[in-house]
Design a protein with these regions (language model features):
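Surface-exposed beta-strand edges and their flanking turn/coil or helix-capping segments
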Residues: 22-26, 108-109, 151-154
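Short, low-complexity, polar/charged sequence segments that are solvent-exposed and flexible
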Residues: 8, 74-76, 112-115, 156-164
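Active-site mouth of glycoside hydrolases
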Residues: 1-104
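Substrate-binding cleft/loops of secretory-pathway carbohydrate-active enzymes
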Residues: 68-75, 98-137, 145-151
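Substrate-binding clefts and catalytic carboxylate motifs of secreted carbohydrate-active enzymes
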Residues: 56, 84-85, 120-212
Length: 212
């Protein structure tokens, strides 16, 4: 925060809630709300004097139903907004990120004020059509998966796993990157990549090229 204050970098501060594909809807149980209230009040008091702080959010990808972000009608979100207004009062508050009205990027018109996704390459021309046709006002999270560089992989993978592979065929790769396997994508784009230790560097470069 100090460095952001000094360098003019605006901060989007989320409270410590995230769906992560487990519990998309934030808890409204009284016991949880009491704990959340205490931590949220401490967080606002600690951060509110930083000039870099621009906006608060209830959390990451909180959804009432699939593809529909939580709104202020949720008791959890309503409580956090009240805390922000009472203890800060100068900053904007968004129920969650993305704030919708749709959660994920889409070519459908008029429903993409603030969206997330996608995180994988959608192919040519589909990927570029989707991004080009979306009329979102703010694409607040998106990305592309890729393998780590060869030097990094050698720091945590056992020798027997230091070769190109689909995630499903090696438990060590799977443990570290279950969602983000790119082997088949990269073979489709660049041609067959043999699963030999000598090709590890080639594989990571191809993977990162697609990410870029």
């Amino acid at each position: 925060y100090r460095l952001c204050d000094e360098n003019g970098i605006l901060v989007w501060q989320e409270f410590i809630q995230s769906s992560s594909g487990i519990d998309n809807k934030p808890s409204e149980q009284e016991e949880f709300l009491e704990l959340l209230k205490k931590t949220a009040e401490c967080a606002v008091r600690e951060k509110r004097n930083h000039v870099s702080l621009a906006v608060y959010s209830g959390g990451n990808e909180l959804m009432e139903t699939p593809d529909r972000p939580c709104g202020r009608e949720n008791k959890n979100i309503a409580m956090l907004e009240e805390i922000v207004r009472r203890l800060d009062g100068r900053r904007a508050f968004l129920p969650t990120s993305a704030s919708g009205p749709r959660e994920f990027v889409t070519s459908e018109k008029g429903v993409s004020h603030d969206v997330h996704g996608s995180w994988r390459y959608e192919g040519n021309p589909g990927h570029y059509v989707l991004y080009g046709e979306s009329d979102n006002l703010f694409h607040s999270e998106f990305g592309m998966d890729a393998a780590s560089c060869e030097k990094s992989l050698k720091k945590f993978l056992p020798r027997a796993s230091l070769h190109p592979t689909p995630m499903s065929q090696d438990p060590c790769w799977q443990h570290h990157g279950e969602w983000w396997g790119t082997y088949f994508r990269d073979c489709e784009m660049f041609g067959s990549i043999e699963k030999t230790p000598e090709n590890l560097g080639l594989f990571t470069r191809c993977s990162q090229y697609m990410q870029g």
